[in-house]
Amino acid sequence: VVSTGSTNDLRISFERRAELTLSAARVAALYRYPVKGFSAERRSSLDVLPSGKVAGDRVLAFRFGGIEVLGDAWSPKATMLCLMNTPGLATLTLALDQDQGCVSVGSEGRTLAEEALDAAGRQRLAEKLAEFALSLPENPLVGHPERLPLQLVGDGVTPRYHDSEKGEVTLHSRESIQALAAALGGELDEVRFRSNIAVEGVKPWGELAWVGRRVRIGRCLYEVTRVKGRCLATHANPTTGVRDLPILTTLTHAFDQEQPTFAVSMRPLGEGGRIMVGDDVELLDV
């Protein structure tokens, strides 16, 4: 959680973003999300694959029944059980053990399910998640019997179920978190934004000016391709599952954004590689 800091001007002119550059930036935290829309897994390192995706990231998803998609193929998040449509999922802890090929589901320190990723285990996990979702006041299953049974898709290895089929690595600065927290008047957990990389040492919103530029992180070189549009998933408190902060309207009203954006997407220039907490971050195209 990042506390608010004082600020004299919460409104930033995004025409001046090119002025916002790096100052001794470093990687502060790394995350991946093995199951689409569920728990963050904090890491000391991440391996970025030649495909441009993080190894072990979004390798599974709970997809609605009746979706006409071939096998484990990618589909939009609107076809899945996720924080955007079911904020209460944030109260669950889902852990993937890739070595053992199993998924465990926990809540408030209790294990609700632990199953292998075989056909029978996937069915039991899907049934448990559907039962849990239907118990929540906000869920996409009530009144939609065609969305059942849920299907647990993915091979547990291949990164696939990102917001876009292209995937890519996502990054935000903690200075931007602090600026947004100040506008909201409270504390803000960066996990709301589900980025892979959090950096420190960047002026607030400076990373938004990196689009089209090259960034070196440790020994790896990336091109920043676009800013990241946001959805209602960011409104869900990562601990309580309650939609408790107006993230989207704050981004547009307090910071003059036409569309709510936070963080950037990047692709590796080359074969990818390993990113470590503490790695230097260098903007090459100043």
Model-derived features with residue positions:
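Metal-cofactor-dependent catalytic cores
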Residues: 2-286
